[in-house]
Amino acid sequence: MQGKEIKLSDYKGKIVLVVNTASKCGFTPQFAGLEELYKKYSSRGFVVLGFPSNQFANQDPGSNEEILEFCKANYGVTFPMFEKIDVNGENAHPVYTYLKNSVPNAEPEKIKWNFTKFLIGKDGKTLKRYESRVKPADIEADIQELLK
């Protein structure tokens, strides 16, 4: 949220977990698990990228600054958080347009809810999509496998 543009290619060589987030959602406590994964594996080349979105039941209505402060104060978030974006529709951010169309062996599908996660390999290819109900801890084995 520093106002500079970042590309997914900036993270080439890292394992990346991209997540659309919201601060007033039943899945909001997943911030804690995401931060735990980030702290545990960031030194080994893993990063979480958080993209706030207000597209689902207005569950992230705050300003970018308010969202960042909420995440830090309530969940100790230190992983990169970006400006609020749309993940679906004609104004969908290009990162999400790409992600939705790049999951192997899956039809492109719109994001259904907050905390949908995409796992990207070191080569920049999208490997897997996890729906909202999948907790960060449930992804850990996949991350460990990629870090071998």
Regions found by a protein language model. Give the residues of each.
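Conserved helix-turn-beta segment immediately C-terminal to the redox Cys motif
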Residues: 9-15, 24, 28-52, 71-75
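Soluble non-cytosolic domains of exported or imported proteins
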Residues: 25-28, 89, 133-134
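Extracytoplasmic/secreted proteins, especially bacterial periplasmic and envelope-associated proteins
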Residues: 33-36, 62, 66, 90-94, ...
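Short, internal strand/loop/helix patches
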Residues: 65-114
